[in-house]
Amino acid sequence: MKLFHISHTDLDGYGCQLITKEYFKEGFFYNANYGLEVKLSIKKVLEQVLEYKEDEIIILISDLNLTFQEAKDLDNDVDKLLKNGYKIKLQLLDHHISGKKSAETFPWYYLDDKRCATKIVYDYMFEEYEGFDCNTSDWLKPLVDAINAVDIWLENEVKNFEFGKVLMSMIIKVREINNILFADLNRDFRCYLLKQAAKYLDEVDGHIKLDNDVHFMKKDFLKLSNKDDTLDNLSATYLVKTLVDVKDDLTVIYKGHKGLLTYCLGSISIPANAFLRANPEYD
């Protein structure tokens, strides 16, 4: 089965993808905010599925409410693929009430405003598939409950709500890996942090301990050796390594000079100089 999963760009959206990554292990993942990003992500998925006519395909959209026109267009596009012999299951799982009209019109559009999307996706894994074993559920279910508490604002669930607030802040502040140029790595980074954060759920004042340790969790992910360094330096070294991995795709030649064309990278001076030192063939 080939999974294509589009989700939102916040804690709830990445929580959904942590779940599908744990279950399916591999797939094609995209994150989008509303408007044009959603349209482009859907367009990309519909182009990619053309390569997998012999496979069973699931297109999952989570924590994103489509406009009625977007839902209608997607329904028509998938229907055409089905008539051409593709084996596609389309499913949208969301909790935003603004999608009510679409949910009442299209059977694949599931809406429940009493649960966040992460919790809906988690339950869906048990309803439609085999769910998770006890070892995974033991850490994943409490994490889902914390995300649910903060996303739909359940202040009465004090422990989950406070923990969820730290999770939300942690995910918002992931800036060490660019989410445009390195979307997959950025997503993996966020999912890593969420999975590590789950270890604090059973601790006394776990939300405070997690808040204190996020800095060190980031450093552990970014370290390419056992040598410790500042977070900025580790980020720069990691960025240089990722740029080297894709430098052939980003290289430009102009008037005999060799350069690297990057985009959407802020605070570039430190990693740029580190890249040039490590790759002297570039001007």
Where on the chain are the PLM-derived regions?
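Hydrophobic, aromatic-enriched interface-forming segments
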Residues: 144-247
